[in-house]
């Protein structure tokens, strides 16, 4: 396997980079581990940045994976505020912005993603925020004062979590989404409508199906003008219109990229001894039988762990049903699987919905239904057919549906 | 240490859990594979009740982020949890279930 002189270089010290370093040691990798990050913070997770940090319940520092001393204890060299500028695959080395050349035995890219800018948004206007980093979150949290008017541009998860936190802090909130429904990429419209009702019930104004024309202000933001001519006065604007995977470093070195850095189920890029994990990848999912690019906590953590194990010499495919959660207005929303426009939607009570294709469960979305979502994941993994009627019947345990189907499948 | 009866425990099916508060302490009582287990009911990662989670293969999985704890020991078995949850002794006598809690 690996000799003590081997050196793994990890580029990107976010959640994925941090978890990968941890998993390398967990797998018994004895060599050097170098973790390069552009930010000044040790690896942290982002979910809290749009929730508890904005609510003022905890500081952004609570999002750290481990305290700094932990890395020293594990023999993981943290190289913070250090940008890797280039990869030289032939000499198996990376080059930092300072011109330092660092050789690797294997390289793991956890370069993540960056916010997608809203085209036409003015630069340097006070009160206009994006939310991605530790500092973004602290800056925004400081501006969430009761009575102020917030316009959120983008009805995706980030925008809605910001809207939720701001409503709970007493701001007047309007969410603008150019698509006709919230969470357009993530959920079938019928289920997303439930999320819209939740926000409306808590007093947020929703403007769906209308794009933003321009943001007005002079030094500080004053209003958001919509394409239909409406002008929304604003003290604060938060833009959440998606993220872009940071593929350029690997692309420049010759790696293949197609809506994310292309990796196989063992997290290998098309460059020899170069692996990738987390937001940046476009990977083959053996359960879904197709390629996906995921922007989730689960993927950042578990694909990174899978990559680390493969680097350490195990051969284990990364194969999980995509799972995601969001906390909004006191409701924990979880989804497992992937949406499809052709899905049949089946409700099981008021708080759990399934998406079916040819009687197979492909998606489940729950509102304060964590335990049931986990059972639903099993149904998706098993790729069995389940009659919609049984699924809708709350008297039938989801676990029992799995057993029934397994039994009938094994009967000749 | 003292034993506390758990009312309604017998209604639990296999691999099911109930949440309760005993002596101001949140407790998850679990029936799994013919055995009873009692754990502190709050996940060590972020606030969530384990009794609302999923039970499988001798572990209970947190409903919030899917961290797993071993039922018998409370040991962390899957990220993001790294700290164990306390576990408490359980006994079943004459159709009644009791949990032993520290004073």
Show which residues each predicted segment covers.
Chain B
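N-terminal pre-ligand scaffold of iron-sulfur
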Residues: 1-57, 71, 75, 84-103
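Short Gly/Pro-enriched turn/cap motifs at secondary-structure boundaries
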Residues: 79-81
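Short cysteine clusters
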Residues: 43, 62-65
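Short helix-to-coil "ATP-lid" hinge immediately C-terminal to the conserved N-box Asn in the Bergerat
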Residues: 68
């Amino acid at each position: 396997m690996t000799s003590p002189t081997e050196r793994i270089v990890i580029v990107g010290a976010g959640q994925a980079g941090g978890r990968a370093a941890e998993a390398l040691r967990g797998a018994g990798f004895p060599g050097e581990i170098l973790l390069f990050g552009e930010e000044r913070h040790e690896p942290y997770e982002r979910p809290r940045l749009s929730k508890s940090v904005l609510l003022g319940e905890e500081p952004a520092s609570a999002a750290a994976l481990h305290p700094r001393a932990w890395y020293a204890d594990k023999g993981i060299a943290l190289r913070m505020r250090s940008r890797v500028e280039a990869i030289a695959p032939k000499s198996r080395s990376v080059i930092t912005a300072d011109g330092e050349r660092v050789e690797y035995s294997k390289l793991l890219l956890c370069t993540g993603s960056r916010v997608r800018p809203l085209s036409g948004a003015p630069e340097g206007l006070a009160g206009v925020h994006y939310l991605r980093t530790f500092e973004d979150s602290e800056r925004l949290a400081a501006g969430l004062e009761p009575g102020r008017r917030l316009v959120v541009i983008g009805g995706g998860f980030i925008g809605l979590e910001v809207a939720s936190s701001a409503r709970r802090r007493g701001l007047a909130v309007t969410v603008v989404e150019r698509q006709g429904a919230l969470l357009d990429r993530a959920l079938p419209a019928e289920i997303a409508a439930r999320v819209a009702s939740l926000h409306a019930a808590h007093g947020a104004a929703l403007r769906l199906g209308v794009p933003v024309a321009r943001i007005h202000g002079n030094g500080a933001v004053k209003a958001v003008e919509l394409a239909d001519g409406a002008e929304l006065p604003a003290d604060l604007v938060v833009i959440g219109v998606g993220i872009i995977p940071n593929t350029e470093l690997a692309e420049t070195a010759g790696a293949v990229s197609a809506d994310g850095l292309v990796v196989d189920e063992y997290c290998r890029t098309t460059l020899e001894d170069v692996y990738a994990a987390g937001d940046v990848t476009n990977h083959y999912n053996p359960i879904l039988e197709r390629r996906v690019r995921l922007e989730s906590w689960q993927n950042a953590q578990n694909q990174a762990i899978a990559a680390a194990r493969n680097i350490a010499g195990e051969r284990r495919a990364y194969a999980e049903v995509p799972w995601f959660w969001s906390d909004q207005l006191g409701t924990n929303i979880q989804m497992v699987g992937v949406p499809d426009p052709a899905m049949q939607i089946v409700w099981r009570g008021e708080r759990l919905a399934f998406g079916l294709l040819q009687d197979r469960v492909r998606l489940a979305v729950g509102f304060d239904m964590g335990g049931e979502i986990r059972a639903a994941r099993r149904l998706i993994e098993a790729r069995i057919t389940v009659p919609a009627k049984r699924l809708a019947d709350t008297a039938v345990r989801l676990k029992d549906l799995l057993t029934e189907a397994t039994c009938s499948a094994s009967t000749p | 240490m003292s034993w506390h009866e758990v009312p309604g425990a017998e209604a639990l099916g296999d691999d099911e859990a109930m949440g309760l508060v005993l002596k101001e302490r949140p407790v998850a009582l679990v029936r799994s594979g013919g055995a009873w287990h009692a754990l502190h009911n709050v996940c060590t990662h972020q606030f969530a009740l384990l009794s609302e989670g999923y039970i499988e293969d001798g572990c209970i999985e947190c409903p919030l982020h899917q961290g797993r704890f071993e039922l018998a020991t409370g040991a962390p078995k899957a990220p993001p949890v790294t700290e164990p949850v306390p576990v408490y002794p359980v006994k079943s006598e004459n159709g009644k279930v009791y949990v032993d809690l520290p004073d």
